[in-house]
Amino acid sequence: MKVRILTVGNKMPKWVQTGFDEYHKRIQPMLNTEIVEIAAAKRAKNPSDANLAQYREQEGQAILAAHAAAGREQLWVLDVKGKMLSTENLADKLADGMQQGDDIALVIGGADGVSPEVLAKADVKWSLSALTLPHPLVRVVLMEQLYRAMSINHNHPYHRGN
């Protein structure tokens, strides 16, 4: 099983890259992960609602192209309106995916969200939190949660939940 993180944006602060890299390094023995950075649409200084929709559409086309290029993989999209999963639920979903041999493309949309087309094609819509999180922080939180879920599946002492 492989998890590709398709994320819009590529100029992350050093602390984001450091945090992401740490969990990426830790998870590799348990789960093959890869990050695919997709260029964010160029934004106007004071974008209109129509501009925002256009940005989501442009980024959505790039996300779907990256997903299609990989062949067969489930499409999981992070979305504030998605289903919330506990870490244990995520561990179960990943364990099921590993048993079935499913690859996953996990989408972190742009600063203005994801396009309706990407949401329509999603196999899973997942909300990390009801809170609004800074876009760069989501990369770190996502990778930490993947690592935590896989540590549960491998009986690693990292997770000390219930």
Curated annotation (Swiss-Prot):
<feature type="binding site">
    <location>
        <position position="78"/>
    </location>
    <ligand>
        <name>S-adenosyl-L-methionine</name>
    </ligand>
</feature>
<keyword id="KW-0808">Transferase</keyword>
<protein>
    <recommendedName>
        <fullName>Ribosomal RNA large subunit methyltransferase H</fullName>
        <ecNumber>2.1.1.177</ecNumber>
    </recommendedName>
</protein>
<comment type="function">
    <text>Specifically methylates the pseudouridine at position 1915 (m3Psi1915) in 23S rRNA.</text>
</comment>
<keyword id="KW-0963">Cytoplasm</keyword>
<keyword id="KW-0698">rRNA processing</keyword>
<dbReference type="InterPro" id="IPR003742">
    <property type="entry name" value="RlmH-like"/>
</dbReference>
<feature type="binding site">
    <location>
        <begin position="128"/>
        <end position="133"/>
    </location>
    <ligand>
        <name>S-adenosyl-L-methionine</name>
    </ligand>
</feature>
<dbReference type="InterPro" id="IPR029026">
    <property type="entry name" value="tRNA_m1G_MTases_N"/>
</dbReference>
<comment type="similarity">
    <text>Belongs to the RNA methyltransferase RlmH family.</text>
</comment>
<dbReference type="Pfam" id="PF02590">
    <property type="entry name" value="SPOUT_MTase"/>
</dbReference>
<keyword id="KW-0489">Methyltransferase</keyword>
<dbReference type="GO" id="GO:0005737">
    <property type="term" value="C:cytoplasm"/>
</dbReference>
<dbReference type="GO" id="GO:0070038">
    <property type="term" value="F:rRNA (pseudouridine-N3-)-methyltransferase activity"/>
</dbReference>
<dbReference type="InterPro" id="IPR029028">
    <property type="entry name" value="Alpha/beta_knot_MTases"/>
</dbReference>
<feature type="binding site">
    <location>
        <position position="109"/>
    </location>
    <ligand>
        <name>S-adenosyl-L-methionine</name>
    </ligand>
</feature>
<comment type="subunit">
    <text>Homodimer.</text>
</comment>
<keyword id="KW-0949">S-adenosyl-L-methionine</keyword>
